[in-house]
């Protein structure tokens, strides 16, 4: 994000684009057992929408607190000591704090860090609802481009499947006809077929994992955080005989609710690489910007009541130094 035209960012993007175009060209020109019009009718639209979504992920970007001037920290030391506080819309809606109850601050970007925001060392900038940094995009997946990233994975899986079926059919026909006794195999076609196998298997697995994450309303970072805190909690329960468990506070209660929260509420939004309708409706507000997130009503009432009290106290009491350790995007619930 800090230098989108650098060599390290251009190389993976050019490589990905060339692989798409090369595989499409070989499929359209080297396959003779399937009508050319049928190949073009299926391959070209799938290729076009996959590449469009690929560059949509890059152009849209994940979003950063730096995009919001009111999240800039003017005095880092004052913010760490509690003398400077984030905007009220963040302080009243923020659910993940440091261990000492203070708001999270990025010492590199000098910004307040909303819920689910993390600093990416590759991009060297804070990312809203950061999921992961993808080297094939040379870009992070975050709040603003997560929907398009999921759609790109689905389009790529479909494209790889079509190429795999067509090339395998052509090679199978060539082998069954005994043509291998008279001519060499088409190595371009064989290379595309092998690449399609590798891409289809790997991207299909990652697509399934990503869709599962969407249905759980969890990011990859939060999954790893949950694992770490779950191990710590098991040690705590064994040591003190407690019976506590971890809960993802951003889980809206059902897979469909979580899916619609990210992908939109209609089939049109799910299939087409367009902005969600709720994002367009809230374009001139702070909603749907990755600055705060919806949670289940029962969880929201419980957490926000304590958060409002903490916010009032932080604005009145004498400040103390702030610890740097972050509290995970989870809630420890007493099961008794």
Swiss-Prot record:
Q: Which residues lie on this side of the membrane: Cytoplasmic?
A: 1-6, 59-147, 210-336
Its PTM note reads: Autopalmitoylated.
EC assignment: the record states 2.3.1.225
Q: Which residues cross the membrane?
A: 7-29, 38-58, 148-168, 189-209
Q: What is the effect of changing residue 134 to S?
A: Abolishes autopalmitoylation and VAC8 palmitoylation
- Note the InterPro entries from the entry: Palmitoyltrfase_DHHC (IPR001594), PFA4/ZDH16/20/ERF2-like (IPR039859)
Q: Which domain of life is it from?
A: Eukaryota
Question: What is the protein's membrane topology class?
Answer: Multi-pass membrane protein
Q: A biological process (GO) annotation for this entry?
A: vacuole fusion, non-autophagic
The DHHC domain sits at: 104-154
Which top EC class is given? transferase
Q: Which family does it belong to?
A: Belongs to the DHHC palmitoyltransferase family. PFA3 subfamily.
- Other remarks in the entry: Present with 2133 molecules/cell in log phase SD medium.
Q: What does this protein do?
A: Palmitoyltransferase specific for VAC8. Palmitoylates VAC8 at one or more of its N-terminal cysteine residues, which is required for its proper membrane localization.
The identity of this protein, by name, is: Palmitoyltransferase PFA3
- Cite the source lineage: Eukaryota, Fungi, Dikarya, Ascomycota, Saccharomycotina
What gene does this protein come from? PFA3
């Amino acid at each position: 994000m800090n230098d989108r035209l650098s060599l390290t960012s251009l190389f993976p993007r050019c490589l990905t684009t060339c692989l798409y175009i090369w595989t499409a060209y070989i499929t359209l020109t080297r396959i003779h057992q399937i009508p050319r019009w049928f190949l073009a009718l299926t391959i070209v639209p799938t290729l076009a929408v996959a590449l469009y979504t690929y560059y949509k992920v890059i152009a849209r970007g994940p979003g950063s607190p730096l995009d919001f001037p009111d999240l800039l920290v003017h005095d880092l030391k004052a913010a760490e000591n509690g003398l400077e506080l984030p905007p009220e819309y963040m302080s009243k809606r923020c659910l993940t704090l440091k261990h000492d109850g203070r708001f999270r601050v990025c010492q590199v970007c000098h910004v307040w860090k909303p819920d689910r925001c993390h600093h990416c060392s590759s991009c060297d900038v804070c990312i809203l609802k950061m999921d992961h940094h993808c080297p094939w995009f040379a870009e992070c997946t975050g709040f603003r481009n997560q929907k398009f990233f999921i759609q790109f994975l689905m389009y790529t899986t479909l494209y790889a499947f079509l190429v795999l079926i067509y090339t395998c059919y052509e090679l199978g026909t060539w082998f069954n006809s005994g043509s291998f006794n008279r001519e060499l195999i088409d190595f371009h076609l064989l290379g595309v077929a092998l690449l399609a196998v590798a891409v289809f298997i790997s991207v299909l697995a990652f697509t399934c994992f990503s869709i599962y994450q969407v249905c759980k309303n969890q990011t990859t970072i939060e999954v790893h955080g949950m694992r770490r805190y779950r191990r710590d909690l098991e040690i705590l329960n064994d040591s003190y005989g407690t019976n506590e468990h971890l809960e993802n506070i951003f889980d809206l209660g059902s897979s469909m609710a979580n899916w619609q929260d990210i992908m939109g509420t209609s089939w049109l939004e799910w299939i087409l690489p367009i902005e969600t309708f709720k994002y367009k409706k809230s374009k001139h507000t702070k909603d749907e910007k990755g600055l705060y997130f919806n949670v289940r009503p029962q969880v929201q009432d419980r957490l926000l009541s304590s958060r409002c009290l903490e916010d009032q106290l932080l604005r009145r009491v004498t400040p103390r130094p702030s610890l740097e350790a972050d509290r995970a995007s989870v809630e420890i619930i007493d099961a008794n």
